[in-house]
Design a protein with these regions (language model features):
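Blade/loop signatures of beta-propeller domains
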Residues: 1-24, 149, 157
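A short helix->beta-strand "capping" segment at the edge of beta-propeller domains
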Residues: 14-35, 318-326
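Blade-loop segments of beta-propeller domains
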Residues: 32, 36-39, 59-100
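Repeated scaffold domains used in trafficking and secretory/extracellular systems
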Residues: 36-40, 82-87, 127, 132-137, ...
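Beta-strand C-termini and the immediately following turn/loop, strongest in propeller blades
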Residues: 51-57, 95-108, 137-139, 143, ...
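Asp-box/WD-like beta-propeller blade repeats and closely related beta-sheet repeat scaffolds
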Residues: 80-155, 171-172
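Loop/turn-rich, solvent-exposed surfaces of beta-rich toroidal or solenoidal domains
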Residues: 243, 258-314
């Protein structure tokens, strides 16, 4: 099939066997599917479309579910898509992605693809399956700025692109850059992950004030990972695997504990009132909790049933002496994230033998 092809709805409804939560399976075709990485929204703000990647044509392509009809539409027909780079705009007009060494803006009405930038880089991401190797990108909440990392020789580079003109500025070059995220309350502030032993960094959009926000405790052999912003607070949350989630304020450096269970990939809703996380070793289901109140216990909303491959997560921090090769296919991880209106949570699961996309409804009055 080709760009613009419409597929009938594949939606199936059922209830979680253990929690009774209402779940909708969005895709059913026997192929690999996944929504964007958990730090990237899967919907536009008005929830007209759910954006995802499907391998049903033989290569990863961008698809949407048109939510008013349930139909699926293929948006791209490429052989060079970087499938974890996909980032929908908040206003619902575009999807941004990288392919080859170029950055593209796709119009969701006309399906026109406009090349915004060509880095002519040796490669756009690191080798492997995790972290900087995923090639995720970041879009400011006003949709004006798009941040991309790529390689310049042996170094990583961070560039910020004007989404209208394609004019860009390279604001940082260093040993390792990944998992870029604009602060939801400040389009001039970007989080990025540095080396695995020194991850938590922030930088201004213009390249000034590049600083370490949190220093890993080497004596405790801390495993700091999967950082995400808490809207409305200027706090950056991070997983202290497997001991829970802490956060730190970028202005005051005040730190606090959010929760103490084995949260794996965790992200807030846009309002900053709820947080969701998948779990592993052991998998105790997808959990919802309040990032503002660490005394409130998390609640299990459903069980994704994903294989969550990545045996290195079962032991202590494995990167103390440098990067190691791991096997952790990302489409086997649930990566839950909220819809803009917080009524549902999207996740991926390969429970059926193929990675499919699901939505679970957030119970009303959960608190």
């Amino acid at each position: 099939m080709s760009k613009g092809t419409i597929y009938p709805s594949e939606s199936l409804a059922f209830k979680d066997a253990r929690t009774g939560a209402e779940i909708r399976q969005v895709t059913t075709t026997f192929a690999l599917h996944h929504h964007p990485f958990f730090i990237i929204p899967a919907y536009d703000d008005e929830m007209k479309r759910l954006i995802f990647v499907s391998h049903r044509t033989g290569a990863p392509q961008i698809f949407v579910e048109i939510r008013v009809t349930g139909e699926l539409m293929q948006l791209t027909d490429r052989d060079d898509l970087s499938e974890w780079s996909v980032h929908p705009s908040h206003n619902g007009h575009y999807v941004f992605f990288t392919a080859g060494t170029r950055g593209w803006r796709l119009d969701l009405e006309t399906l026109e693809e406009v090349e915004l930038v060509n880095f002519a880089a040796t490669r756009m991401r690191e080798e492997g399956m995790v972290g900087a190797a995923m090639g995720t990108t970041a879009l400011s909440h006003d949709d004006q700025w798009w941040a991309i990392r790529y390689n310049v020789g042996k170094e990583a580079a961070l560039s910020v692109i004007d989404t209208e003109t394609g004019v860009y500025e390279t604001i940082l070059q260093r040993d390792r850059i990944g998992h870029l995220q604009f602060c939801p309350d400040d389009s001039n502030l970007i989080y990025y992950a540095g080396p695995l032993t020194d991850r938590v960094w922030v930088i201004n959009r213009g390249g000034t004030n590049n600083q370490r926000l949190y220093a890993r405790n080497v004596e405790k052999n801390e495993w700091i990972t999967h950082e995400s912003w808490i809207p409305g607070t200027r706090e950056l949350a991070f997983v202290d695997w497997p001991n829970g989630i802490r956060c730190i304020n970028v202005d005051t450096n005040q730190e606090r504990q959010i929760t103490s269970f084995n949260a794996w990939h965790a992200i807030c809703n846009p309002q900053g009132t709820m947080m969701v996380a998948d779990t592993n070793f052991p998998d105790i289901g997808i959990q919802i909790f309040d990032p503002r109140d660490n005394d409130r216990k998390p609640k299990t909303i459903c069980y994704a049933g994903a294989t969550s491959v990545g045996e290195h997560w079962a032991g202590p921090f494995p990167y103390a002496d440098g990067p190691i090769k791991v096997y952790a296919p990302q489409h086997t991880h649930p990566h839950p994230s909220f819809s803009p209106d917080s009524t549902c949570i999207v996740f991926t699961s390969d429970r059926s033998g193929h990675a499919q996309i699901y939505e679970v409804m957030v119970p009303t009055g959960i608190w």
